[in-house]
Every structure is written in structure tokens, then in C-alpha cells.
A protein has these predicted regions:
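A conserved helix-loop-beta module that forms one wall/lid of the active-site cleft
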Residues: 202-214
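Conserved small-residue
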Residues: 16-18, 23, 76, 104, ...
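Short beta-strand-loop/turn "lid" adjacent to the catalytic site in phosphate-handling enzymes
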Residues: 64-102, 130-134, 161, 165-186, ...
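N-terminal glycine/serine-rich phosphate-binding loop of ATP-dependent small-molecule kinases
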Residues: 1-97, 125, 153, 222-226, ...
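Pocket-flanking alpha-helical
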Residues: 86-88, 109-113, 246-248
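Active-site core segments that coordinate phosphate-bearing ligands/cofactors
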Residues: 5-6, 115-128, 138-173, 180-201, ...
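Short alpha-helix plus adjacent loop in nuclease-associated cores
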Residues: 100-117, 447-448
Length: 505
């Protein structure tokens, strides 16, 4: 029987699945890792230890758990956190820690420099939007200005998925979906290296070859087979970013579909049949031919609940270690005992700056309205509602500002384990949201793409028919009215305090 492997490397955890030709999961595995935060605003990974190390561990564990021969795996799909940057040598050895996505603000001086040099209009023309911390070109420029020897020595500047593909196949590639984050280093019309665009940042030969995410980049090499346990010669997909793979995992295939990914951060992908121009968002090419992804992302989601767990629920964490209930379940229970609106407590969830729609890496988190009657459960509730407000802000931009219909909102990621959070999103947005039948995330999307590329399915439409919805959450319209009445306070809190936030940095 043929099997298809999908592995995703995330911010704080990596996951993998093996599926059969009917998209049934036959084995799954995960492992945790730490994100380095050596300075305020710096977030980085050791690519060799985390990205490659996790991939090798998971591939071996999945083969063992499924009790299959490696040769039964027909195709390998992969994804990883996007908008990151690691310089590598000719053998794909990392030359420096990988700079992570928008949460890493070290390239802000380069972004400011580019905006000053080009002006906003020209910068938007080059980057597709106002340059921000999720763009990779400013990160490349950071290496050039701060680690010039590494910059000069680098054979390629890669994202995590490109790095993994190169380790597996020996070929340096990147898919079109992630290549958008490298603008203006690629030409969006031809997807070839833009030599003029590279001039300010790097050599043209330091860029990877652009392909489709579902293209076969190559096959498992001898060395990769030894390290991963996979069979030599197994086809490997180019791969893509975790958010794109996560959207695929939920069945977000058609214009009008929207994915809300609740992981360490929140990420949104709305599928459209045409490109839009909006400096607040990240519109670009999507994985599926003929579709465009209006993408957006916050800097905190699960990372904020993890902070609350760590700082306010140490007793629950200790109890969990001793065999008690999961600390996150305790937090959800406490939040559920607090009514909508958290008794007047609001949270601005900008604990690591903010990406869309604010594009402000110096934004800061706020709990507003605290009184003696508020408990830690109120703070959890307010944090979940604060993230729900950011979801609603993106829904409004898509529907009200661009007149695009949102037919379905699919929730995915670790946040779907929290019923209070899902209900808050439905209530703040005032619309139903659904949870995919399979919620293991991007690794499942990777396996689906491997099944498609490996011949188990002939089209995206055929693949869509085997996926489904596990749960639909209807909004409480009374709660929606309460949230709507306080929306202006949430918005004004940032607008009136952003200058003070910047003074603190």
C-alpha cells in the first residue's frame, strides 16, 4: 500500500503525519523545541539542530510507528514557518542562526532605511506592500550590514522549507507562495531572479530557483536517506510555508474561503480570484493555480496564552506535571466562567509588536480596565477576545474595504482545542466559523499535496471531496452586539497610545 509523508517545522513545535491513499492518518508524531530570544525583538532558530534535527527525528519515528518499510512512502511533502531567512553554504550548512518571521524586529533599521530611500509609493511597488518585518529582503540586508563575512560567503539565502528541501534533495528551490516574501529579489511576472532588484541586497546567484509547491524538486539523496530513514530515490516536493500548507489541510481551495490559523501567532489566508492592492495586508500568489491569497498575520496568538500559562498558571503547570489536567484546559475552564466582555477588561495582544494591519513592530501589549474584582480567568478571557478582535479587523478589511465575500471561515491550529476562543471569534465577528475534520495542521496539508503530486488524486477538486468539517460554531448575536459596542475602545486604545509605546522601546 502506498503512503504519503508530511512534515511541518513550526515556531515552537514540529509535527508529522503519514497518510494512506484515502487520506487517512496512519501515524503522527510531534516534538517540541525552543526559540532563541537573545535580545529584545530578536527571535531565531538553529537551523541544523531544530529544522533538520526535527525532520530527521519525525521521519524515523513515523516510519517506526506505522510499521512500514520506507520504500512504501511514495512522496514526501514538507512545510515550515515562512518569512524567515538563513544563509547557507554550497552544502546547505547554516552559516548563522536563522532569523524568524515578522516577530523578529531586528531589521527595522533596514526597513526604515528602505522607506527613506525609496519612498512609500516606490517601496510598495517593489515589495507589493509597505516593507515590514515579514519581508525577507530587509533580513538579507541586515546580514549584509551586520554580518558581512557571512553575507559574502553565503551560497543561498533560504527559508526553512527551502532549506529542508535542499537537505533532502541537494537542490535549492522555493515555491511561488513563499517567493512573494522575497520581493523585489524575484520578478513576480516571470518568477525569475530580478537582477536589478537584487542589487541593493545580494548577488543574484544567492537566490533559489522558483517552482510550484507541488512540483517534485528531486529525490532523497544517499546522505539524506542515512539521516532521515527515508528510502533513497523517494520523490520530494518543493514544499511551502506552514500557513499555506495549513490552508490546504482545511480544504481552503476556492475563492471566498478563508483560513484562520491559531498557532503561536495567528495567520489568515483568504482566497480570491484576482489580486488586490492593500498596503495593510500581504496579497500574492497562492499554492493552487488561478487563485490569489490575501494573507495577513498577527505576532501573538498561542504565544500569548503560553505566556499567561507560564506566568499566571504555574500551579496548574505543576499539577499537570504531576498527572493533573492540562494547564491549557484549566485556563479555558476559567475563561469560560467569565462572561463575554470579561467584565470590562480589554487586552491589546501586541506582546511582540504587531504585523497586520498595524505594521508596527514597536506596538506593545496592554491589559486595560483592571480592577480588584478581576481574576486570572478574566485576563485569559480578555486575551482570547483581544485576538478575536484582530480576526474581526481582517474580516472587515476583506469584506467592507474590498467588497469580497467570505463564504467560509475555517479555523485550524492548536487554538481550536479551546472552545472559548473559537466561540469568541464567532461572536466578535458575528458569523459562523468551522473547524476542519482533521486539525493536526500543516503537516496534513503537506501529506495531501504529496498524495496529489504522487498520483493518488488527479485534481484539487477530487482531493476536496475527501475532506470535511468536524464542527461549526454559530455566533451568539447578543454577545456580538456587546463586542461591537466596545470595538471602538479596542481600536482607540492603540491609536491613542502607540506613540507612548514607541517611546518605551
Amino acid at each position: 500500500m502506498p503512503y504519503y509523508l508530511g512534515i511541518d517545522i513550526g515556531t515552537s513545535a514540529s509535527k508529522g503525519v503519514l497518510i494512506d491513499a484515502e487520506c487517512r492518518i496512519v501515524a503522527q508524531a510531534s516534538c517540541q523545541h525552543e526559540t532563541e530570544n537573545p535580545r529584545d525583538g530578536w527571535y531565531q532558530h538553529d537551523a541544523e539542530a531544530i529544522w533538520w534535527g526535527d525532520f530527521c527525528r519525525l521521519s524515523r519515528e513515523l516510519i517506526e510507528r506505522a510499521s512500514i518499510e520506507a520504500s512504501q512512502i511514495r512522496c514526501v511533502g514538507l512545510s515550515a514557518l515562512g518569512c524567515d531567512c538563513v544563509p547557507v553554504d554550497e552544502d546547505c550548512h547554516a552559516l548563522a542562526p536563522a532569523i524568524l518571521y515578522g516577530v523578529d524586529a531586528r531589521s527595522k533599521p533596514q526597513i526604515d532605511e528602505l522607506l527613506s530611500e525609496y519612498g512609500s509609493d516606490r517601496a510598495r511597488e517593489l515589495f507589493g506592500h509597505d516593507p515590514c518585518s515579514s519581508d525577507i529582503a530587509p533580513k538579507v540586508l541586515w546580514f549584509k550590514e551586520n554580518m558581512p563575512e557571512v553575507h559574502e560567503r553565503a551560497a543561498k539565502f533560504l527559508t526553512a522549507s527551502s532549506y529542508l528541501c535542499a537537505k533532502l534533495t541537494g537542490r535549492f528551490t522555493i515555491d511561488r507562495y513563499l517567493a512573494e516574501d522575497f520581493l523585489p529579489l524575484y520578478d513576480r511576472e516571470t518568477w525569475r531572479v530580478n537582477e536589478r532588484g537584487c542589487a541593493r541586497f545580494c548577488r543574484p546567484d544567492q537566490m533559489a530557483e522558483v517552482m510550484a509547491a507541488t512540483d517534485i524538486a528531486g529525490v532523497i539523496t544517499d546522505r539524506a536517506a542515512d539521516e532521515t530513514g527515508l528510502a533513497k530515490g523517494t520523490p520530494v516536493l518543493v514544499g511551502t510555508g506552514d500557513s499555506g500548507a495549513e490552508a490546504i489541510s482545511t480544504g481552503v481551495f476556492c475563492p471566498g474561503d478563508m483560513m484562520v490559523q491559531l498557532g503561536s501567532t495567528a495567520y489568515f489566508i483568504y482566497l480570491a480570484d484576482h489580486m488586490v492592492d492593500d498596503a495593510r495586508l500581504w496579497p500574492g500568489t497562492f499554492i493552487i493555480p488561478g487563485t490569489y491569497g490575501i494573507c495577513a498575520g498577527t505576532n501573538t496568538a498561542g504565544a500569548l496564552t503560553a505566556w499567561l500559562r507560564r506566568e499566571l498558571y504555574r500551579d496548574a503547570v505543576d499539577a499537570e506535571r504531576s498527572g493533573g489536567p492540562d494547564a491549557y484546559e484549566v485556563m479555558a475552564r476559567d475563561a469560560g466562567q467569565v462572561g463575554p466582555g470579561a467584565d470590562g477588561l480589554l487586552c491589546l495582544p501586541y506582546f511582540a509588536g504587531e504585523r497586520t494591519p498595524l505594521n508596527d513592530p514597536e506596538a506593545r501589549g496592554v491589559f486595560f480596565g483592571l480592577t480588584e474584582r478581576h481574576t486570572r480567568g478574566h485576563m485569559v478571557r480578555a486575551a482570547l477576545e483581544g485576538i478575536a478582535y484582530t480576526v474581526a479587523a481582517h474580516v472587515d478589511i476583506i469584506e467592507r474595504d474590498h467588497g469580497l465575500p467570505i463564504e467560509h471561515i475555517m479555523l485550524v491550529g492548536g487554538g481550536t482545542k479551546n472552545p472559548v476562543w473559537m466561540q469568541a471569534i464567532a461572536d466578535v465577528c458575528g458569523r459562523e466559523v468551522s473547524v476542519a475534520k482533521v486539525t493536526v495542521g500543516a503537516c496534513f496539508g503537506d501529506a495531501l499535496m504529496a498524495a496529489l503530486a504522487g498520483g493518488a488524486y488527479s485534481s484539487w477538486g477530487e482531493l476536496a471531496r475527501v475532506l470535511g468539517v468536524a464542527q461549526t460554531i454559530e455566533p451568539d448575536m447578543d454577545a456580538h452586539e456587546l463586542y461591537a459596542s466596545r470595538r471602538h475602545i479596542f481600536d482607540e486604545l492603540y491609536a491613542r497610545n502607540c506613540d507612548l509605546m514607541h517611546e518605551l522601546v
